[in-house]
Structure formats: C-alpha cells, structure tokens
Amino acid sequence: MMLLLPFLLGLLGPGSYLFISGDCQEVATVMVKFQVTEEVPSGTVIGKLSQELRVEERRGKAGDAFQILQLPQALPVQMNSEDGLLSTSSRLDREKLCRQEDPCLVSFDVLATGASALIHVEIQVLDINDHQPQFPKDEQELEISESASLHTRIPLDRALDQDTGPNSLYSYSLSPSEHFALDVIVGPDETKHAELVVVKELDRELHSYFDLVLTAYDNGNPPKSGISVVKVNVLDSNDNSPVFAESSLALEIPEDTVPGTLLINLTATDPDQGPNGEVEFFFGKHVSPEVMNTFGIDAKTGQIILRQALDYEKNPAYEVDVQARDLGPNSIPGHCKVLIKVLDVNDNAPSILITWASQTSLVSEDLPRDSFIALVSANDLDSGNNGLVHCWLNQELGHFRLKRTNGNTYMLLTNATLDREQWPIYTLTVFAQDQGPQPLSAEKELQIQVSDVNDNAPVFEKSRYEVSTWENNPPSLHLITLKAHDADLGSNGKVSYRIKDSPVSHLVIIDFETGEVTAQRSLDYEQMAGFEFQVIAEDRGQPQLASSISVWVSLLDANDNAPEVIQPVLSEGKATLSVLVNASTGHLLLPIENPSGMDPAGTGIPPKATHSPWSFLLLTIVARDADSGANGELFYSIQSGNDAHLFFLSPSLGQLFINVTNASSLIGSQWDLGIVVEDQGSPSLQTQVSLKVVFVTSVDHLRDSAHEPGVLSTPALALICLAVLLAIFGLLLALFVSICRTERKDNRAYNCREAESSYRHQPKRPQKHIQKADIHLVPVLRAHENETDEVRPSHKDTSKETLMEAGWDSCLQAPFHLTPTLYRTLRNQGNQGELAESQEVLQDTFNFLFNHPRQRNASRENLNLPESPPAVRQPLLRPLKVPGSPIARATGDQDKEEAPQSPPASSATLRRQRNFNGKVSPRGESGPHQILRSLVRLSVAAFAERNPVEEPAGDSPPVQQISQLLSLLHQGQFQPKPNHRGNKYLAKPGGSSRGTIPDTEGLVGLKPSGQAEPDLEEGPPSPEEDLSVKRLLEEELSSLLDPNTGLALDKLSPPDPAWMARLSLPLTTNYRDNLSSPDATTSEEPRTFQTFGKTVGPGPELSPTGTRLASTFVSEMSSLLEMLLGQHTVPVEAASAALRRLSVCGRTLSLDLATSGASASEAQGRKKAAESRLGCGRNL
C-alpha cells in the first residue's frame, strides 16, 4: 500500500487532494471535488473517477471497480460502477439542495476497489441567476399623517431572492418623489431592507395619497429585478403617533423552547391624552403565515409569545414586522422590526449507517492488516459541536479498528490477521456519540463472518516415525500408517500422501488416500541395516500446501549369510601353505606367504610367543560374516586331517599353530587339513576350507622361485615412466628453442641513416652507436645477364690472356682504392685468400661485377649463393639516341621481335631475374674496357635523377658523356638528387617509354620504396654500338678532366630515368658487411675495415709506377661518381667547387704520369698531399 501512495499523489487532478494516515497501509482515503452548474439537463457528465485516479476500467470482469457507499437522497446523481462516471439523473436545483447556503456542497463516498482507495466525492453546485427578487406582495399600502415631521421613517416590505452570491438581492430603488426618499438598511445578518423617509412636509389638501414604485434588483449577469407598488395615504392631522423604544430588535431563542413561552415584551409610547394616547400592537400586513402560526402578540401589552415548537434544522431565523397605533382618529402607526434567531440545541441523536465493501459481511481470513472492511457513517442533524460525532468499537479480541476519514465518516479496518479456524464469526458493536453539552449517543451491532482460505498445511500426529521389521520380508508387507490433519474446510482440508523421491523411495509405497506404507520388495539387512524416507502430505487447496515427515525403517538381522574366508586366499575352497624348515637344525622358519617376519595376523608380535613356548604360528585364518550379533560371531575348528594332533587352531582367533620343536622329519611331507568356520546363529551356517600344508627346505624354495618370471615393482615402473616423460619434454623444448632462434634474413638494400635512426627506437635491441665520420655509403656497380657457374673456369683463362694482350695486365696489379662493393665481391667469391696470389681472381671479379645478373630480392626467399662466380659477360654499353632516330627505331623494332627468356630458377641474388637476351663479350675485350663503359652508364644514371637542363648528346662517345656531365656540374646546371636508400638509387618516377628510348632496355628501372619493380624487356646491343677503349682513352681523356669542355647541347636526348646499374652480388643481412671506411689506405698488410673490424686478407702487391695511371684514373672516377650519386643536394656553388677539386685531381694524375720514373712512394706522397689540401679522392 505504501507503493500506492505516491501513485495516488501524482495522479489526482488539481481539484483533488489526498490524505492518508500513517498506520493505514492498505486503503487510501482520497477526496475528489467536482463542480457542476445547476439547472443542467439530465445525463450531464459531472466527472469520471477512473480518469481522476487513472485506474484501468474493469470492463467484462467480475465485480465492480467503483461502488457508492452512501448517497444523499436529494442529490440527483448517478454513477457507472465500471469506470466511475458521474452524471445527473434529473434536474439540479441549487436552491432546493442548499437553500441559502453558499457554497452549495453535496458529498458522498465511493469505494474504488481497483485502486484500493476510499474516495470522498464532493460536488459543488454552482448558482445561476435563475431567480429574481420578489416582494411578499405586489402592492403595499401605508398611512401617514399630514403633520408627520421630516425624516420620519416608514419600513417597507423586504424583497427575497433565492439566488446567492452576486445573483442575490443587491439593492432597492424608488421612483422619483419630492416628498419621499428611500434608505436601504443592512441588518446584522447581511440582510437588506428599505425604509421610506419623509423629506418634505405633507399637505393633505394638496396631496391626499402618493403612488410610489419600489424596485429590488440583484447583481447577476444580466441583472434581474422585482417591483412593488407602494401606496401612501395622507391622513388628517393627529398630533402624535406611537413610538417604539427601538425600531429594530434581534432575539435569539433555543429551538427547544416550549410553546407558550414569552419571547419579548415590546413597548411604545404616545404623549397624547385619552384615546389618542392609548396604544395597541399587531403584526404587519405583510407578515408570512408561517410567522403568524409560530408567534403571537398581545395587542395590549405587546408581548410576543411562542405558539409552536421551533426546529432549527427547518428554519433557523424569523423576521417579524410589529406595528403600534393609538386609538385616536387618523392614527399613524409606528413600526418595529424583530429578528428572531433560533439557536440549535442537541436534540438529535447520531444515526449509524454501515456500508460493506463487499456488499456482505463476509470477509476472507487472508486479509492483511489494515484492510478495508466497511464504511461507517454517523449522521447528526445538529450543528456545531452538537453535530460532531465520535465513533468507537466494542470488541473482545481487537482484530478490527475504526479510522476517521472526514467529518463523521469512519473506515472499518482489520487490526490483525484473521483466523477462521479460531474465530469463524466476529461480533462487533459500533458506538456513536455527538459532542453536545448533553451528548447523545447511538450504537449498532455488527457480525462479520470469516471465509476460509487454504492457510493451513497438513500436520502429522508425530514429528518422526520409526518402525522395525525383519529382513527377507515378503513384498507388500505393511510397515506403518501415517495420518495428517488439515484444519481448513472443504478441499483445503483434504489430505493426500506421497513419498519424496530418494535413493530408497523405490523400496516402499504409500496409499494416496489413507497413508498406509507397505514394502515393495524384500529387504536385506546386509545391504542396509535401515533406511529413511520422507512422506509428503498435501492438501487440495489453491495454492497447495504441504508438509513432510521422516520415517525410519530398521531392519532386524536374520542369519542368512554363511562365513566367508578372506585369508588365506581360496581357490575353489582350497589353499596351500608352504613352511620353510632348516634342514640342518630342524627349526621352522617363517611361512613363505609371510616373508616380512611379522605376525601373519597382522598384530606385529613375533610368531614365537603367540601360543606356547613349543608352538609355531603358521597362519591366521581371517573370515567374516555379513550378519550382525550372534549371527556374525565365528568359531574356527579343524574337522579333518589332524589325526596326529600336529596342528592346533584357535577357536575364536583362527590362528593355526604347529606343535613341534624339530621339523626335520616333516621335510617333504604335506598335510591336508579340513577347517570349518561356523557362526553362532540359529540355525548356524558354516564354511569349509581345505588347507594343504607343505614343509620344504630353503634350497628347494630358492630353486622353485628361480623359475618364476620376474615382475617389476611399482617404484621401478614409476621411475621408468618419469624418465620417458622427461625425455619427451627435453626433445620438445629443444625443438622449440631451435625454431625460436631461427634468424629471418633480410638482405634488402641497406641505408645507414635510416637503419641507425630506426635502430635507436627499437627497445628490444641493444643500441649500436655508429659514428657518421667512420662510414661512407658508396654506389654499387651492377651488371646484367645471368651467368652460369659452369663457364667460370674457362672465363678465367680467357680474360687473363685478353688482358695481357691488350696491355692492361699491369693495371690490375696497380694499387688502387677498392670500393666496398668490389671488396665484398672479392670476399664472397669462394674464400680467396690473398689478392696478390692470383691476378686472374681480380680480373674475374671486375668481370663479374659488371656482368652479374640482377635478381629478385631474396629477403623473403631462400638465398642460395652460387658456389663459383658466373661466367664473364660483356657489359651492355649503348650511346644515348635522339628520340625518333633511325637507330632508336631499329633497335626498338628489334626489341619487340625478340621474346624474353626467363632466367634460371637456381640463381639466387638479392634482385629478381631480368629477361635479357644479350651476347657474350668478345674475348679480345679487356677489363678496363668494361670498367670504362660501366662508368659511362653511371654517369647517365646520374642524369636520370633530375629533369636535365642540358642533356648530353646521344651519339657522343662514352668518355665525352662523362665530360659533358662534369661540364654541367661546373656550370651549376646539374644538382644530383640526394639518395637516402643506401645501395639503391632513386629515380624520378615515370620513366620514358620503350618507344622513345629503346636503348635503355639493358638497365634496371628504379622504383619508389614499397612498389613492385616493373619487368623490362632487354635486347642485345647492336654491333655498331661497341666502342674501342683505346680510341676513348686517346681522344677523350683530356676532355674528361677539362672543365671548359663544350657540350653538344643540341644533340642531347632525354635520358631514361627508369634504369640504373644492377647489383653485382647479393647483400648480406649484417649491415656491417654493406658499409666501408672510405679513408682506409692500401697496404700490403691484411686489410681491415676500420669501422667494423672485418679482416679481408692480404692486399694486392704494389704495381710498378708506370702502370698507376689507369688504376688512379679508375679510382678517382669511381669516387667522383659515388659522390654524385650518393651526396645530398648541394647548391650550385658547391658543384663548381667540386669541379675545381676535380681539375686539381687531374693535374695530380698528370704529375703522377710525369714522374713515372720516380719511386712509387714519392709519387704516392705527392698525390696524397694534393688530395688532402683540396679534398680530392673520396672526399670529393
């Protein structure tokens, strides 16, 4: 109910309010107010209670959602019990319902069963201006003497208006007159009446009468009025008229005043003498008949007496007009208004009205506390304290209480839970008493019947049942009958029985109606000595209630089990016991079955002292009997085979002894003993055992046991299993470690700057501090087609002979600077030891450097290096052609006709295979010839790094192309693009198409990092493209070193930026192997890279001074082009400075050539001095 409180507070309309007592938790008292205007037609809707409370309408359901508990008889209102719709049943007349009461409120109570609330409905009937003011008579006649003085007042009849508020009587008005005026007087009770006032002297001779119109009007919209004609007759002069001591009086009398009681004595005086001074009293002409019947006046004395009983409830006030006149002629009466108020007295006893919530006095016993039972209304017709009623209950148990809701209305609530089984009928007495000085009371007796609910579970007669029975009972044996009682009525009190499911519930069964328990099967004491099950008793009410009880069944043991021998172990009722005998002494040893030296019975006592000093314990027979008590007590005896009384068997313990001190004579003999084990039951059961006792010596025993197969013990088996598991675990661990330590080789091109930066930010690797001054990134010379390993030996001999014939063999012996690429080439070509050991190796290295094919990056493939260097291949050297030239078109057409050939799958390098159908270089061509062509190719690669301002002529010889490159550098028109990719050279994306420059097919196109390398078709060079090395050296050497060499700019063709030299050998995963110290000097000692300390082997021997020109030229040109391809972007001024250094280096070369007759050390010293001053060599 506490949950209903906020619901009701939030759902009531603005005209409603809720109050609820703190001790009432089941029924809320709600007050709902409605307003309706009077005179509405029948059937007009006043309000809907379901909308006010927002409860669901119970259409089509049993019972009513709303019920009127008390309705005034005069109120024409009806209610729909389903949704609480209030409407008028007939015409509403506020004046009839409330008379002059304002506001007009009528109330009644409604019980909302859906919301568990008592609704106090209060309907305010609003007044409309449906009545006009009315005078008692339409015409009133007055008499006045012509000698009346000014300001004489004559009371006029008061008009009545049944409406209230603004619609009631508002004021009066008088038609215009020069002799009379109107004065409106407001009485103590807010009533208004008019008085006629003389404002001008009267003259009967001029005006004998006056006709005036008195109008009374209200303040309604529109206002209504009523008129009365006042006729004033002017009489001859009578000097004086009677005058009352007070013109108006108010009198209060109790309503219980006895008729005939004098209420007031009025007095009036007239100063005249004789008849003109005698005064008589009478009621005015316009006094109502009700007043005339209720009151009377004595004409002589002026006493007003009560003629009949008063009733405050009918008329609480009376207004009386009393007049007094003398007995003279033309008498003028005097007027006096007397207001008589009736005082209410406690003359009405309270009346008690009971309205049941369920239309009957039958209540359910499962009602919770503070449940609503009935509405008690105490009515008292008296007013004030006389009408205030207090009610209370007179009861024995205190299960009910009354709670005031509003006024004299109470709710009858439950004060405790009800119990039909103890009190099926409750008798209550309701007392009501008002609050008057002499209180009046009333009483009413109530009888409340309690209906039964299923609130009692069945109860067994005992809290636990126990029963005993013999085992091996027949099925359907009666065990016990259970009985449970239920105090409820009808089906709520009918009890049924069942057994709760359990492991033993299948052993018994119970009758559903009677509760008789029987056994379903034969019971066995040896399986269970007793069992317990639960019986559930349930009634048939809703909801169903149940109770349970435990029943213990004890089984009595019967001797139904024979003894069972456990030791010795029997085989078909037989057992064998071997006893060891010392053949020399005849002493008995332990039985074979008991090698531990302890008592066979397990007592821990040595066998010697068990029975007697001369006896020996052979065996303890262990038997058991599943029966209990005497049925399980066992007796042991030897039945047969002991005729010589050699053995003794303990009857109670089952210990078998032998009575002998020297058993030498028993060796080899055997005894068959018949042993009987018998219980003490009735009848007794027994078991027979055949025991064979054999006496043997220790030698015989050992001989027999040698033939028995060996059996591994449990600890040995455990150790073997543990060893196997550890071995398996070790193998798995070794396999796991070997897999985890497998290195993933990444032989991609290395960038020292990026590697150093990324290496520092890897927290799982140690920091490798690399000094930038100690390392220098050099370009790698690359070759072309794949060569097989099988042609390598023939190439060695051929290249050497060709080199000697051309006069260049001395060049290979000259000391020159090895680039890291050349050094790795020498190191990786088959474990060669010394450079001076074989000049052919160096020559083969150069050939391999420029002719080795480029393959796919093997960082994610299996890297299988060739066991021997591939065969020599003539490097591809093609002059640049102008786009559209005949040579370019012929070559392009030839390339289109040739189909590419796939390289051998067995070749493994860091670059992927290229499809190239090239020709093998002629044997007559020397190594320097190939080196020069490679340098030309590197120069064109440098042009591919930019959009050239000036382009070298495509038909110029190779050395002239290098000269043109240097001239562009000198003029500041070429700035090499910086390279940050180590041994890879970036090129401008979007190279020329094959149709434009077809002679660049033999070179590798560059690609951005992370992109796939495009496959380019490669074609063989044309014969006319081969150049003579001698002609190159004779005609163009001077122009190579001359900074003022002119360029044929008009013949330049755009280079193809999509190619560069191929990598000659695969790179290693160790970045140290891809770097070199550029400042390392040549020495005859074994050479070592200063940065990483890797020993290569002995260097080449110094060549004669006359042959150093070609070696120096190759070294300086290699250093120059390394700088061009690997340096960062420099301004034009830096390029000019580099060219000036190159000129000095050229003069250094000339100096070396001029001083060929000097010693090698002197020439080398002068050269290094010049280089150190201007930064020649690798510092260029």
UniProtKB/Swiss-Prot annotation:
Phosphoserine: residues bearing it: 859, 1064
One of the GO biological process terms: calcium-dependent cell-cell adhesion via plasma membrane cell adhesion molecules
Name listed for the protein in its UniProt record:
Protocadherin-12
The record's listing under PROSITE patterns reads: CADHERIN_1, CADHERIN_2
Instruction: List, alphabetically, the Pfam families matched.
Output: Cadherin (PF00028), Cadherin_2 (PF08266)
Q: Which GO terms describe its molecular function?
A: calcium ion binding
Q: Which UniProt keywords apply?
A: Calcium, Cell adhesion, Cell junction, Cell membrane, Glycoprotein, Membrane, Phosphoprotein, Repeat, Secreted, Signal, Transmembrane, Transmembrane helix
Q: Which residues lie on this side of the membrane: Extracellular?
A: 18-716
Regions crossing the membrane: 717-737
Q: In which tissues is it expressed?
A: Expressed in endothelial cells: localizes in vasculogenic rather than angiogenic endothelium. Strongly expressed in a subset of invasive cells of the placenta, named glycogen-rich trophoblasts cells (at protein level). glycogen-rich trophoblasts cells originate from the from the ectoplacental cone where they rapidly form tight islets (at protein level). In adult mice, present at high level in mesangial cells of kidney glomeruli, while expression was not detected in other types of perivascular cells.
Summarize what gene deletion causes: Mice are viable and fertile. Mice however show alterations in placental development that result in embryonic growth retardation: placentas are smaller and show limited angiogenesis and mis-segregation of the labyrinthine and intermediate layers. Mice also display modifications in the structure and function of arteries, such as rearrangement of the arterial wall elastic fibers.
Q: What is the lineage of its organism?
A: Eukaryota, Metazoa, Chordata, Craniata, Vertebrata
SMART domains membership: CA
The record places domain Cadherin at 28-135, 136-244, 245-352, 355-460, 461-565, 600-711
Q: Name one GO cellular component term.
A: cell-cell junction
- Enumerate composition-biased segments (Polar residues): 904-918, 1076-1093
